[in-house]
């Protein structure tokens, strides 16, 4: 049976064996239960949890398609097209609506991510529904993987990650005359496709999300002994996100 180490997996080692994915995790019983719930609800485009292998790794079904990094560079037009923006929004709406039924179980705790915000809760957040975790087939969104960071939360909190990494212009080549109108259009397209109004403070929500999840939580986990988060600090990921936050504070108003 063919074995292939998959690209990505910044937090866990990921190996494809045959048609399934074997992932080394720290043990996420609530995430496993949530994926089984989504399967029962008939939600397509998400991995199915199949059990554990002889090494104790989680086994998931493989989602065929292309992803950012192995197949697309971060600035590939496909990833930032109007179609992709709307596809991601519709996918997140489908996922969030289905997840509401899991809330009574979810609020009992036991999630792998201990840093989720206080209630009230509306749905189950994917936790890292950024563009690099979506799967594309024929340049259209076909699925979403890496549910290890899932936790109870609000819709807008989860959408902040998806929106910011897909529709917001990059800070390193930003030109308001070229990028501001496109960003404004795509932000509106995103929320129209999701079916909820764009909150007037969406830029602030994104800033809070990036600051908390991508900066503060990474530092806290590294301090607690998480080796992968320590690698992220060494690699300079926090500096990238801090620059992104400064970019949002300076230019975000131009997109509203």
Residue spans of the language-model regions?
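Active-site activation/catalytic loop segments of kinase-like enzymes and analogous catalytic loops
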Residues: 159-195, 210-224
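Active-site acidic catalytic loop and adjacent metal/ATP-binding pocket
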Residues: 12-16, 114-158
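ATP/Mg2+ or Mg2+-diphosphate-binding catalytic cores
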Residues: 214-256
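A conserved alpha-helical element in kinase catalytic cores
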Residues: 10-12, 18-98
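Protein kinase glycine-rich loop
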Residues: 5-6
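Conserved kinase catalytic-core helix
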Residues: 73-108, 122-127, 132-137, 189-196
């Amino acid at each position: 049976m063919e074995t292939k180490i998959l690209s990505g997996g910044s937090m866990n080692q990921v190996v494809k064996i045959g048609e399934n994915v074997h992932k080394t995790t720290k043990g996420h019983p609530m995430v496993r239960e949530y994926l089984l719930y989504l399967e029962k609800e008939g939600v397509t485009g998400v991995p199915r949890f199949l059990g554990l292998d002889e090494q104790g790794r989680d086994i998931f079904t493989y989602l065929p398609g292309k992803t950012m990094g192995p197949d697309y560079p971060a600035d590939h037009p496909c990833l930032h097209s109007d179609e992709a923006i709307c596809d991601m929004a519709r996918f997140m709406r489908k996922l969030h609506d289905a997840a509401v039924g899991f809330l009574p179980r979810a609020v009992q705790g036991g999630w792998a991510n201990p840093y989720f915000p206080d209630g009230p809760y509306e749905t189950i957040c994917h936790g890292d529904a950024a563009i690099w975790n979506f799967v594309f087939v024929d340049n259209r969104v076909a699925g979403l993987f890496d549910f290890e960071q899932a936790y109870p939360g609000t819709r807008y909190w989860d959408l902040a990650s998806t929106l910011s990494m897909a529709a917001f212009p990059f800070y390193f080549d930003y030109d308001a005359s070229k990028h501001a109108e496109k960003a404004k259009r795509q932000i509106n397209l995103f929320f129209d496709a999701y079916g909820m109004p764009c909150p007037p403070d969406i830029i602030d929500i994104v800033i809070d999300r990036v600051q908390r999840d991508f900066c503060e939580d990474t530092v806290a986990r590294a301090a607690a002994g998480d080796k992968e988060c320590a690698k992220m600090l060494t690699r300079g990921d926090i500096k990238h996100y801090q620059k992104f936050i400064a970019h949002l504070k300076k230019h975000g108003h131009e997109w509203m």
